[in-house]
Amino acid sequence: AKATVISIEIEDGGKKKIVISDNGQGIEKDDLNNAFMPHATSKISKVEDLDTIHTLGFRGEALASIASVCHIYASSKTENDEVGHSIRIDGGLFSEVNEVARNKGTTIEASDLFYNAPVRAKFLRRSKIEESEITHLVEKFMLAHPEISFLYVVDGKQIYNTISSELSD
């Protein structure tokens, strides 16, 4: 939340690796584990909140689903934390939360997609097609959020590096 810079890196159409980093508020140490639990969300505390949500991912399903079929490394640091914290999740199995040196914000790395679900892996399209779909999604986010700087890297090659601007600029 409240990020001004977002970095997205993918390898092999996202099948080998996807890394997303931001300089936002970060995730509290105690919430780092919870972020990957099914139905975990910080966006709903009462029924009325359902009518006022204007963001993606409020149901708490995405991270838990992804963590069940790949290797996850997540690290985060809030402004109030002296050090950051990290966790590894392998196919839904959680490690302990550890301390890590990092700047404020969050990084989530997902690697080896469907390593433990080969039947699901067969439904992935060719890497170039998956890459194209991800690129199209990143472009939509860049256009929808000019106030955020985006870095987008595909297989080690920088594709986009935008500079944030206000709509009035």
Q: Would you name each region that the model predicts?
A:
Residues A1-D169:
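N-terminal phosphate-binding caps/lids of nucleotide- and nucleic-acid-binding domains
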